Amino acid sequence: MSWDQVWIDVNLATMDPSISAPYGAITNAAMAVKDGKIAWLGPRSELPAFDVLSIPVYRGKGGWITPGLIDAHTHLIFAGNRANEFELRLQGASYEEIARSGGGIISTVKACREADEAELFELGRQRLNALAKEGVTTVEIKSGYGLDTETELKILRVARELGKHHHVDVKTTFLGAHAIPPEYKDNSDGYVDLIINKMLPAVIAENLADAVDVFCENIAFNLEQTERVLSAAKAAGLEIKLHAEQLTNMGGSALAARLGAKSVDHIEYLDEAGVKALSESGTCAVLLPGAFYFLRETQKPPIDLLRQYGVPMVLASDFNPGSSPICSTLLMLNMGCTLFRLTPEEALKGLTLNAAKALGIEDNVGSLLVGKQADFCLWDIATPAQLAYSYGVNPCKDVVKNGKLVHQ
């Protein structure tokens, strides 16, 4: 056989649902890569003969290979920090109170408007490197810290540039509808007009976004405004998603499902009717335990209902300066299990196959299958559950992206 590389002495957590074993596991396995794709995988005993003198062979020393991790919800590009708000919350102020007093998102908006693209790029590069060291091979990055046309475009341009200069694939999301900027404080509908009539066309003209998101909440955008933005995005051919039911149940998830959104994110206050709507539309539920933890919330997402209705559950970092300044997907695996009571298998699926579904890229990445992109990680672990069980010592040994060894 003519391959570019072969991996032996490994176990595979394929996350292939057609394999009945937990994690879609194949133990005592091997895998071959050709032209950036997975060319063969299966039991080591069935590996076809190949020229060991001309094809590089990598020995996994009994470790586990998983698909490359996918962080499907981040706000990775921003300037400044909000440590002062952290102190205020510990003194009793709520996230909502801080936001209504001009803090929160708006304070980061000010810092991002003042920062240039070079500064934002370097900050983003450092954060992307941190995720990459934990096995992340695809990341979603949202705008939303500009809230004016110029700065929203600036953030999205930086995200696109990161994707061009880093081995991690970057999917971009336009989140102009993240908060009401101060200049539109008493005219939120006017700001929605600006998003639809000026911002969105400018984003599309430069091909800066793969999707559009809205923060549907009582401190941000109401249902009517949310539908206007998402409908405009959908009409332009972009994927849509929604921050919904984080602080209250406004019915945003049902709206997103009706419009065919790829995902609804946060969903702590989602009810059974909303879960049923997601199930019927095939919309993913993105769980963000980092924000739940950091804001010291008590209302948990309806995990049992999501299981009951078969809604794909995704885990993501929600890395951002205000509610989840936690740049770690491995920690999300642990938090998903300890805080939301996911199983380790559900958690890993939420950072691989289901995360790919949330971004609409599941045909190419998210599981180990012949013909899929060769994005995978070798972990120094005895069982896949260890990825969620223990945190602090990074067990990621090798990362392969598009068939190339990028981290060793």
Swiss-Prot record:
Location in or out of the cell: Cytoplasm
UniProt GO MF annotations: imidazolonepropionase activity; iron ion binding; zinc ion binding
BP-aspect Gene Ontology terms: L-histidine catabolic process to glutamate and formamide; L-histidine catabolic process to glutamate and formate
Residues reported in the UniProt entry to bind N-formimidoyl-L-glutamate: 145, 320, 322
Ligand binding (Fe(3+)): 73, 75, 243, 318
Superkingdom: Bacteria
InterPro entries recorded: Amidohydro-rel, HutI, Metal-dep_hydrolase_composite, Metal_Hydrolase
Pathway(s) it belongs to: Amino-acid degradation; L-histidine degradation into L-glutamate; N-formimidoyl-L-glutamate from L-histidine: step 3/3
Keyword Iron appears in the UniProt entry: yes
Gene3D superfamilies the record matches: Metal-dependent hydrolases, Urease, subunit C, domain 1
Keyword entries, A-Z: Cytoplasm, Histidine metabolism, Hydrolase, Iron, Metal-binding, Zinc
EC number annotated for this UniProt entry: 3.5.2.7
Binding sites annotated in the UniProt record for Zn(2+): 73, 75, 243, 318
Enzyme class: hydrolase
Predominant subcellular localization, coarse grouping: cytoplasm
UniProt: 4-imidazolone-5-propanoate binding residues: 82, 145, 178, 246, 323
Necessary cofactors: Zn(2+); Fe(3+)
GO cellular component terms, A-Z: cytoplasm
Reactions catalysed: 4-imidazolone-5-propanoate + H2O = N-formimidoyl-L-glutamate
Textual note on the cofactor: Binds 1 zinc or iron ion per subunit.
Annotated disulfide bonds: none
Function: Catalyzes the hydrolytic cleavage of the carbon-nitrogen bond in imidazolone-5-propanoate to yield N-formimidoyl-L-glutamate. It is the third step in the universal histidine degradation pathway.
PANTHER family: IMIDAZOLONEPROPIONASE, IMIDAZOLONEPROPIONASE-RELATED
Family: Belongs to the metallo-dependent hydrolases superfamily. HutI family.
Name by which UniProt lists this protein: Imidazolonepropionase
Organism: Shewanella baltica (strain OS195)
